[in-house]
Amino acid sequence: MLADTIAAISTAQGEAGIAIIRMSGPASVSIAEKILRLPKSLNKFKFINSRVMNLAALYLDDAPLDYVLAVYFKSPLSFTGEDMVELHTHGGSLIAKLCLEGLLKHGARLAEPGEFTKRAFLNNKIDLSQAESVLGIIKARSEEALKSAARVLSGELSNKILEIRDEILNIQGSIEIGLDFPEGEEPLINNLELLEQVNKLILNLNNLIADCKTGCLLREGAGVVIAGRPNVGKSSLLNALLNKKRAIVTDIPGTTRDIIEEAIIIEGVYVRLIDTAGLRETDNIIEADGINLAREALNNADVKLWLMDASREPDAQDILYLQKFLDLNLDNSVIVFNKSDLASHTLDDGAGTPVSPSDNNIINNLNKNLRIINISAKTGYNLGELKNLIINLIVKDGSLNSGLNVSSKQLEELKACENNLAEIKEAVEINVGEVIIADLLNSARLSLERVLGIESSEVLLNSIFSRFCVGK
């Protein structure tokens, strides 16, 4: 337990129904009682029971300010694991500020950003992954991001990491005991058994990393870049997906000369739509800068949409730029034929079916694994299918229901463990010796423990919790 008592306003500034001021520390109860009185008699107020909401009069310097609700949480049954008090005043910046000043006057210290959550971690109420998930919940910009952060807060990530960590410890123990065996005695684990266990660890960790990658995309928002040659309808598609006019649309090539980014929620997922300048050779310096930004955006995109004009056959330049696009990465790329409403039509069972250059052998011969979809940004044809395709590419290595909202630092530690396990597998296969394998196992275990904060430096903790708001 920490010796001092901290206080802060936990609710946002401004007018509202209520404002909440919270305290944590050994003197929370005695400090709160100094500014509270019984509502009718105005006699001295005393907390009697923990976890019971009490009506009290708030007094500062013998002057009544407000009637408040006061609740006391006795250690260790509180968020921080310490004695805590919450005072619920009427909403308003001034009354909350004066209430906080009264607590500080009687011995509380103003809390630092994230200090309540930090104390919960230091008092073993939550581990570091759960502490970071609190920030994920606060900053969630979509329903799925919120759900994935809640899964981490509930301990799902911690449990999966501990399962892998415990398996590593078991293997590590068997190997290190074997190092003490006299030469000639049978080891506790042979190479075949070790390889089998390491492969199982790699599989479990890969599945966990896939869920965490999905969670990272949910947390940060997936970048979906709309690219293509000039005048294929990139800005029209952006406007259609947003269901509002955000980008200027004209028949003049090169209208879009800069990156235009807008957010949209698709199936509960936060998606950043990025409209780019049409790719072509140009002598215009401003347009050329926009084209360079478009290429950079494509390289960093989570999903790449390459638009083509369905109303005409592709020419040599279309094919050339399409091939350059396909050279980037097919895993998250889609060829989108826009303007299908202007394509010729045939009848199939009485229904009009657009016939576009996506059926052209020139396109298909570039790569047999192309994802191709026909749409019309103008009429809305197939936009729902395009959205579904985007979501499927975003969560291709996992599912929305298993995504775990983690930070990039946490993901780095999991990948470090993955690299260690790959090195262990190689070491076992070439029989390099148990000492090296034991060291690699230890490194893998430490990476997992850093995610949970089992061994964390003060510098790391300060870096994490300083990102929280005051009062959290």
Predicted regions span which residues?
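C-terminal-of-GTPase-core extension/linker across diverse P-loop GTPases
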Residues: 2-9, 13, 143-265, 282, ...
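Glycine-rich, N-terminal phosphate-binding loop of Rossmann-like dinucleotide-binding domains
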Residues: 23-24, 89-91, 241, 276, ...
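Switch I (G2) and immediately adjacent beta-strands of P-loop GTPase domains
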Residues: 55-65, 70-74, 254-282, 303
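Conserved beta-strand segments of alpha/beta enzyme cores
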Residues: 109, 270-272, 371
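Conserved G/P- and acidic residue-centered "switch" motifs that form tight phosphate/ATP-binding loops
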Residues: 124, 231, 275
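Generic enzyme active-site microenvironment
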Residues: 273, 307, 336
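Inter-motif core of Ras-like GTPase G domains
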Residues: 287-311
